[in-house]
């Protein structure tokens, strides 16, 4: 019993910790005006021996198909801190061991640090990983691999240019550091209560306009660099006080490079401009207005006659 209790205490102190970071993505935005970007994570209580630890670039989060660009098994590491240059330019890895490794040789704690130069080539999805047992799999969602996910995205600025009260809603998404490329795909999703959802994927082209029902999508080049996406939505069936969601993304293959998001709520007091109506509706509206005017005139004449009769009777 005491031996079991002692084992449980050792596992609690030095054993692999349950890390909720597998379901969490650490996100950074790329800016050419900033310093190098740093991703890092500390793995605690990693049991030895293990297969390898390292950094990998992932195609997407759904398949977790990742390709390592740096890895080690720590067999050749004698210093507590070492820096490594990777095969990929603009990436540097620092590995730091924690504590006196001779006290508890069966477990290790170390910090993996990845430094990225602020260039668009480094935009993408990354994982710091430890393969605890067996060979490294091609897909990193297996229980034998502990991973921490990171994402470096391009920054997108979202703004509403024309409000819905003008008859159409115009939203612009500016990505200053994005350049046109044949492997980029843009996605736009529009949703709102009482409205049909729109979903469109299209390949980026210079100065193109795409149409889908009552929505127009435009792409233009920004100067000195960057790309602007513009969404124009005509007369959506949206009631006052109800929200409209517009979600914009750009993908390279299945990896998202940037995202813009707008939520617009029509004011409860707003009156949407009416669409063009047929002649029958216009004639019906004219007749109703004419009858209302005639009724008001007749009521005014009756009340005037009653008032005159009352005044004449009082003088007598």
Swiss-Prot record:
Signal peptide range: 1-20
GO biological process: symbiont-mediated suppression of host innate immune response
Segments traversing the membrane: 286-308
Cellular localization per UniProt: Host endoplasmic reticulum membrane
Keyword annotations of the record: Host endoplasmic reticulum, Host membrane, Host-virus interaction, Inhibition of host innate immune response by virus, Membrane, Signal, Transmembrane, Transmembrane helix, Viral immunoevasion
Topology relative to the membrane: Single-pass type I membrane protein
Principal localisation: host cell
One cellular component term from this protein's GO annotations in UniProt: membrane
Quaternary state and interactors: Interacts with host SEL1L.
Function: Chaperone protein that plays an important role in HCMV tropism. Cooperates with UL116 to regulate the abundance of gH-gL complexes in virion. Favors the incorporation of gL into virions once UL116 has regulated the early folding steps of virion assembly. Interacts with the host ERAD machinery and slows gO decay which would otherwise be constitutively degraded. Reorganizes the host endoplasmic reticulum and activates the unfolded protein response. Additionally, plays a role in the evasion of antiviral immune response by down-regulating cell surface expression of host CD58.
Protein name: Membrane protein UL148
């Amino acid at each position: 019993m005491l031996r079991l209790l002692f084992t449980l205490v050792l596992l609690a102190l030095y054993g692999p910790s349950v890390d909720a970071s597998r379901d969490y993505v650490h996100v950074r935005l790329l800016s050419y005006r900033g310093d190098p970007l740093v991703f890092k994570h500390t793995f605690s209580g990693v049991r030895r021996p293990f297969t390898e630890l390292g950094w990998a670039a992932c195609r997407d989060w759904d398949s977790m198909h990742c390709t390592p660009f740096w890895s080690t098994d720590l067999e050749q590491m004698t210093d507590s801190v070492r820096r490594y240059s990777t095969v990929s330019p603009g990436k540097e890895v620092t590995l730091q061991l924690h504590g006196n490794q001779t006290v508890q040789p069966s477990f290790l704690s170390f910090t993996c640090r990845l430094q990225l130069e602020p260039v668009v080539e480094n935009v993408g999805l990354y994982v710091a990983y430890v393969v605890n047992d067996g060979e490294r799999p091609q897909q990193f969602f297996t229980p034998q691999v502990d991973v921490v996910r990171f994402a470096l995205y391009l920054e997108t600025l979202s703004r509403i240019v024309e409000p819905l009260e003008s008859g159409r809603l115009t939203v612009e998404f500016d990505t200053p550091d994005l350049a046109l490329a044949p492997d980029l795909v843009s996605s736009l999703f529009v949703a709102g209560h009482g409205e049909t959802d729109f979903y469109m994927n299209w390949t980026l082209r210079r100065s193109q306009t795409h149409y889908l029902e009552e929505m127009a999508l435009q792409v233009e080049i920004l100067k000195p660099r960057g790309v602007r996406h513009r969404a124009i939505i005509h007369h959506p069936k949206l009631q006052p006080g109800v929200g409209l969601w517009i979600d914009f993304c750009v993908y390279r293959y299945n990896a998202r490079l940037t995202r813009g998001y707008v939520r617009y709520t029509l004011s409860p007091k707003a009156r949407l401009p009416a669409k063009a109506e047929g002649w029958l509706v216009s004639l019906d509206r004219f007749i109703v207005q004419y009858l209302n005017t005639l009724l008001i005139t007749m009521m005014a004449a009756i009340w005037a006659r009653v008032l005159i009769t009352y005044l004449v009777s009082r003088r007598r």
